[in-house]
UniProtKB/Swiss-Prot annotation:
Binds 7 [4Fe-4S] clusters per heterotetramer. Binds 2 [Ni-4Fe-4S] clusters per heterotetramer. It catalyses: CO + 2 oxidized [2Fe-2S]-[ferredoxin] + H2O = 2 reduced [2Fe-2S]-[ferredoxin] + CO2 + 2 H(+). SUPFAM superfamilies: alpha-helical ferredoxin, Prismane protein-like. This is Acetyl-CoA decarbonylase/synthase complex subunit alpha 2. [4Fe-4S] cluster 1 binds at C65, C69. CDD domains: ACS_1. Its cofactor is [4Fe-4S] cluster; [Ni-4Fe-4S] cluster. CO binds at H109. It comes from Archaeoglobus fulgidus (strain ATCC 49558 / DSM 4304 / JCM 9628 / NBRC 100126 / VC-16). One of its GO terms (biological process) is acetyl-CoA metabolic process. It comes from the Archaea. The gene is cdhA2. Heterotetramer of two alpha and two epsilon subunits. The ACDS complex is made up of alpha, epsilon, beta, gamma and delta subunits with a probable stoichiometry of (alpha(2)epsilon(2))(4)-beta(8)-(gamma(1)delta(1))(8).
Amino acid sequence: MVLEFGKGAFVVDDLRNVTIKIGEIAEEEEEWAPMGPTPMPGIATLRDWDFFLLKRYKPFYAPACDMCCLCTMGKCDLTGNKRGACGIDLAAQTGRIVTIACSIGVSAHTGHARHMLHDIEHMTGKKLSEIPVDLGPEIDEVAPLTELITGIKPKTLEDLERALRYAEEQIVQVVDAVHTGQEGSYLDYESKALHLGMLDSLGKEIADIAQICAFGYPKGEDNQPLIEVGMGVMDRSKAMILVIGHHAPPVLNIADYIEENGLEDEVDLGGICCTANDMTRYYQKAKIVSALGRQLKVIRAGLADVIVIDEQCIRADILYHTKKLGIPVICTNEKAMHALPDMTKEEPKNIIKYLLDGNPGCVILDPLKVGEVAVEVARARRKQRGDDIGPRLTEEQFMEYARACTQCGNCTIACPQGIRIGEAMEAAENGDRSKLEKEWDVCIACGRCEQVCPKGIPIIDMYNYAAWNLIVNEKGKLRRGRGPIRDSEIRNVGAPIVLGTIPGIIAVIGCGNYPNGTRDAYTIMDEFASRNYIVVTTGCMAFDAALYKDEEGQTVYEKYHDRFDGGGVVQIGSCVANAHIHGAAIKVARIFAKRNIRANYEEIADYILNRVGACGVAWGAYSQKAASIATGFNRLGIPAVVGPHGSKYRRAFLGRPYNDEDWMVYDARTGEKVRIEPAPQDLLVAAETIEEAIPLMAKLCFRPNDTTQGRSIKLTHYIDLSLKYLKRMPDDWHLFVRTEADLPLAKKEELLKELEDKHGWKIDWQKKKIVEGPIRGYHAGFNPTNLERCLRDGFMTV
């Protein structure tokens, strides 16, 4: 037998009874950039980087429970450094629980991405290979996370699917590690959690780029139109469809059906959570009713004629409430079917009749059938109920319930906000409903109070009745989600961000589990945008900030531009659009510093940690997705602040400013180790109040690479915000002074005097120079890195 190879073919002589199968044909990768050291990293690939972060930012644990109840050898008491039956201690068990939470979060986003690709093929009738990844002429770095993590620069959605397969495989491997009898080190559990956080960012990018390219969402253009937001924006003269969840394709079919049949004047489409955000990127007449924190208030207000749910952040007891109100529910996703009958294969007319016959709901898993059913059911129900849309309680019922309250205090004990509901009920009984109305916004509508009330008072309905005028008049304005940051924008702001003259990027993201109502979201955005920070925002916090107006009647979205530039408020989109915030930081390294981002995660994360002044805030974070989102930011070198409820995630990453060895970096210019200021000081930290959080966020934008001008600007804001919100100078401001040129010019003499008197620094008053005192001096050529490899081999550039 002779085997001959020729160009493009091979020939085999005398071959019999052989079947030849040709599988996937791999085309040669285009070498647009050198392949970096870590394409498609496994669990252990970036472990050294994780361990560096975990050494500097030591995990601080606050376990919610000292027991482990995960296997039948337990339950095991882990207090007092005891080990469980399997040998695990409390630190490792807490790290394990954190890893489990992150695995749930990353599975939600990655599962969403997989479902998105399936629905795109079904709804468009195209193969993934036929849909190009095209984000317009101003975006060449179309998928910076995908390129950074996998080494793939996608040309079609099929390329994104390859990256998604990698993420899915890695998630399985990490979840395997949380099984009993596997990992035993809290450090390695945290490394695995960081790995999941990175995969979460990848899954989000795949999901959002896919829907942008398939459904024609905005591609990073600024000056986006304003969308109505608030419980008062729904037109009560029309049939009302309420959508809840995060997976938009079924809702897009509703929008198509409304438009194709000319029903815009008859049907109003509104939503809660990320589905609401994404549908407005497709259908501009859609409205955002509320963020997650008001979901139960919206449902119980009875505004909707039909409710359509898909996946994530949907109340598990939604049918319990809708059955009482007679509102049918259509489940469109197999992850949330609520024991309803699957009618996917039924004709739409049969499904419509079934729902109008008074049945509580059904499942429709074909997104192309949802539009007709939802719209026609809503139209029919609107005719049935007429104009009877108002509070669910009568005046007599309201007063009867107010009088029934015995001030037992059970509700306050159950309330995560500690609201003194009984006092508000007593005031209402005496004719003062202002307390209930004021607390309506602080209440996150969890419903726990109703579960413990011995009198069965419908407390949510009481709140809605007292605040009804507020509800019907609540109308704000939100910029439509614009999607990714354009390369052209990065070219303009890369230098100011790295040098510090734009003091930082503030990412306002996450859920609505706020400690004191929704106004905090507005306060954070307005404060930082007014100081020339770049404010980017997504999800529920983006919605809630839109509900408030300044003295001139403008929301933050009307007051500030939406370019990625100083003083901008940029509404990126839904939860999965958070990936574009990661992407912006990566693009700074790629476009401004000319670093090679292809499969080069560790080096780019090192660059961001040392140079890109960015800080995330998830003030109302509640979900496992929020945990994996924050952990993904952390692995990339971006710190995050959470609200007081965020301590329930059980873990913080706190720096120790006093520990010299934690703050040693290499100066690539000289090869020597240098002790730097604690910048950024923490990687994940909970703040108790908004007054504590705002100065903390400004502090977490300090970076070792700041120029003197940039450091002076950042110190000005840090000191000013501390004086404004905490009424005192920050205790640690002097740690960030390297030279007198770092000091805010307007307070230079005052601060030099304080450095001399309070901190013992030596000052040459004749020259007004610092002679002795700083942790380190300033050198314009300082080139910080934490990676020995980069000292040895140099930085990868393109």
